[in-house]
């Protein structure tokens, strides 16, 4: 089963879609919320000279006038150059069955779904009257370790998606259609050159390297170094101090000629790094345990004095 992400409060969560999951003859009323929010800094485009904000106007190339959103429709140009115009009324009349429903089509093993298909992630919240059937679907998927494959229409577009349990909620992942996935077309897949041949000994050594780099996945161990450096730069600009110095780039060792030798050195480095990480983790664990004991002892002394 796919590991569940940590679920917490996301500021500004708002309903993005409202409808029902069609689960056999049972309808489960739900609301859809974006499960993610990027932490990137939001920049404005400004004029270098006077720092005035830059605005982009919607201008018609035919009449040269600025156009309001209400006067903008969609246009599709056919292969022979004809322009087919569609407005919101045309799109609303499309005979789409899943307009206000999440149509559950089938349930499949998670390992059969290639992650390449996944797009965005959403939380599903049950309507108050649908909590029991919501929990039933959640527990059924959890017990069978399956993903529900569904169709949903969002922003006037029908989308394939999957639903899975994550903690106490159901999570929906929108997906690409098969014809939206590009096939890799690389020369090395078809060339007859021998530069893709590897020996059993090299595969064994590469496997050893992978095994020595294997850990339990904890996303909190990783940091966005770019955003941290950007925060330091903005802070320095605000205070009028020197910006942080750029970290030196790692030395480029050039093309690897002795692949086996490079693998052996990599395995040694991975073992050393793994031992160091374990010592650091154990030390941090001991500090937390010691801190907890001190807090407990302090509370006990306080209770005794009381």
Swiss-Prot record:
Homodimer. Interacts with LigD. It comes from Saccharopolyspora erythraea (strain ATCC 11635 / DSM 40517 / JCM 4748 / NBRC 13426 / NCIMB 8594 / NRRL 2338). Belongs to the prokaryotic Ku family. Keywords: DNA damage, DNA recombination, DNA repair, DNA-binding. Residues 274-290 have a biased composition (Basic residues). GO terms for biological process: DNA recombination; double-strand break repair via nonhomologous end joining. The keyword DNA repair applies. Transmembrane segments: none annotated. InterPro entries: Ku70/Ku80_beta-barrel_dom, Prok_Ku, SPOC-like_C_dom_sf. One of its GO terms (molecular function) is double-stranded DNA binding. The lineage of its organism: Bacteria, Bacillati, Actinomycetota, Actinomycetes, Pseudonocardiales. This is Non-homologous end joining protein Ku 2. Disulfide bonds: none annotated.
């Amino acid at each position: 089963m796919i590991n569940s992400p940590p679920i917490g409060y996301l500021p500004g969560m708002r309903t993005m879609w409202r409808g029902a999951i069609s689960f056999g003859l049972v309808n489960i009323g739900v609301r859809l919320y974006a499960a993610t929010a990027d932490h990137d800094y939001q920049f404005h485009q400004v004029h270098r000279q006077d720092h005035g904000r830059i605005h982009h106007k919607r201008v018609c190339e035919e009449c040269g006038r600025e156009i309001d959103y209400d006067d903008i429709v969609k246009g599709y140009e056919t292969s022979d150059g004809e322009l087919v115009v569609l407005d919101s009324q045309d799109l609303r009349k499309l005979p789409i069955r899943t307009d206000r429903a999440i149509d559950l089509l089938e349930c499949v093993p998670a390992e059969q779904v290639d992650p390449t298909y996944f797009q965005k992630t959403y939380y599903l919240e049950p309507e108050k009257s649908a909590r029991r059937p919501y929990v039933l679907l959640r527990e059924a998927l959890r017990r069978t370790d399956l993903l529900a494959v569904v169709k949903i229409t969002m922003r006037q577009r029908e989308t394939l998606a999957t639903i899975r349990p994550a903690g106490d909620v159901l999570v929906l992942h929108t997906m690409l259609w098969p014809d939206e996935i590009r096939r890799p077309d690389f020369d090395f897949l078809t060339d007859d050159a021998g530069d893709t041949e590897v020996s059993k000994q090299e595969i064994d050594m590469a496997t050893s390297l992978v095994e020595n780099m294997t850990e339990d996945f904890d996303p909190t161990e990783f940091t966005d170094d770019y955003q941290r450096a950007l925060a330091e730069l903005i802070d320095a600009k605000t205070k009028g101090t020197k910006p942080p110095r750029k970290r030196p780039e790692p030395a480029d060792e050039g093309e690897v000629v002795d692949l086996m030798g490079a693998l052996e050195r990599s395995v040694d480095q991975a073992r050393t790094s793994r031992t160091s990480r374990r010592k650091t983790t154990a030390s941090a664990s001991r500090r937390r345990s010691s801190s907890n004991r001190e807090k407990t002892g302090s509370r006990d002394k306080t209770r005794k004095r009381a």
